Amino acid sequence: MTEKKKEITERLEREFDVCDKHILRINEALEGLGVNIPMSADCYSNLTTEQVRCIDQFIFRFSKLQDSMGAKIFRYILEYLDEDITALPMRDILNRLERYLIIPSADEWTYIRELRNEISHDYPLLETDVAAILNELFSKSAFKGNRHA
């Protein structure tokens, strides 16, 4: 293994460790939420302060996880594969990862990113919209027991 590949491997391992912590906190937030998922708009509007904290933690960690994967891990993987990604936009990076079968779908990753942006940027959304987006994100976060999900 070349020095460059060793360095990339070390960076990947460090980022995987960071992602594992985010996944742990996501799981803790989901456990602490204590509501049936999918969650109705009525359920969402009647959440306790602690449940809202769990949702906030979920959103924060989900965002951090996706940022870490998109900004670092995906790029490191392609670097390791000797891909020139210097000036590539995120969509092209996702397409290459899909081609290598590293992610199942570039479109799905983009869709999840858009959902995450909607929920995390405090746009004025109806409670039904917030509940629907949260349910969709919850369904995309089945991390229990997965290392490097």
Annotated model-derived regions:
Residues 2-149:
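Solvent-exposed interaction patches of small proteins and small membrane subunits
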